[in-house]
C-alpha cells in the first residue's frame, strides 16, 4: 500500500509542476461520458498512467479519461481508480483543482476500498491521504510532503456547496437547500468537487450535494473515481454520506466503471436533515 501511495505522490508532484505553464485549450477528443477533454486532462492522465505503471504492487488502473480498465500486473492485488484532474474546466480562471485516487483490493467495489487520496493544486500543493484517518500533507521547499494535521468533521457545519442546474432540481431538493440558507448557511460552491469537499474538511463541516436532476436522473459524478474515494475520506473524518436513500454511499454497488450517482457528503446534522427531507 505504501509503495502505491509513494508513486501517487510522484505523479501529483509532476502534475503540479506541469500546471505552472499549462496549455488550457481543448483537445478534439471526448472521454467515455462525452466530456470534451482539455489537453491538460490528457496530459495529467498520461502522467499518472506512466508513473503508476512503474509500481509492481498495482494490478490495474481505471481512469475517468479511459474507456476500459488497464491491467498492469495480474499477480498484484491493488487497483487504482482516479480522476486525473477534477475541476479542469476551471483552469482558464485559475481556480484550485485536484486529482482524486481510490485504492481498491482485488476488485473495484466500495466494499473493497482500502485507501483514498486527493491532491489540491492551489496556492499550495497539498495532499490528503486516508487509510484510517484523513491526514493532510503539504509540500515544503525541499519537495517533501510534510504532515500538517488529522482532518475531522464536526457534528454540524456552516458551508453549503450545492451543484446541479437549479431549474432542473426536484422540489424536495430546492426546499432542503432553502432551509439551509434560512438557518444561515453560507454558499461555497466552486464547480470543482474536490475543492468543495476539501473546504468542508478543512473548515470542519458543512454539506456538498450533487442531486439527481431532470437532465441527469442518475447524477453526474462518477462512483469509482470521485464519489467512493471522497465518501471514504468524509466518513473516516467523522462525517456522513448518502445518495438520498442509502445511509452511506459506500453501500452502493455498480457494474459499470463509469457509473454515476446522486451524492451528498457532510456533517452528521446536514446529512440527517437531508435524509429526513428526502424521505418525508
From Swiss-Prot:
SUPFAM superfamilies (UniProt xref): Carbohydrate phosphatase (SSF56655)
Disulfide bridge partners, by residue number: none
UniProt binding sites for substrate: 86-89, 189, 220
Molecular function GO terms recorded: fructose 1,6-bisphosphate 1-phosphatase activity; magnesium ion binding
Enzyme class label: hydrolase
Main location: cytoplasm
Cofactor: Mg(2+)
A cellular component term, taken from the record's GO annotations: cytosol
Keyword annotations of the record: Carbohydrate metabolism, Cytoplasm, Hydrolase, Magnesium, Metal-binding
UniProt-listed GO biological process terms: fructose 1,6-bisphosphate metabolic process; fructose 6-phosphate metabolic process; fructose metabolic process; gluconeogenesis; sucrose biosynthetic process
Residues bound to Mg(2+) 2: 83, 86, 226
Protein name: Fructose-1,6-bisphosphatase class 1
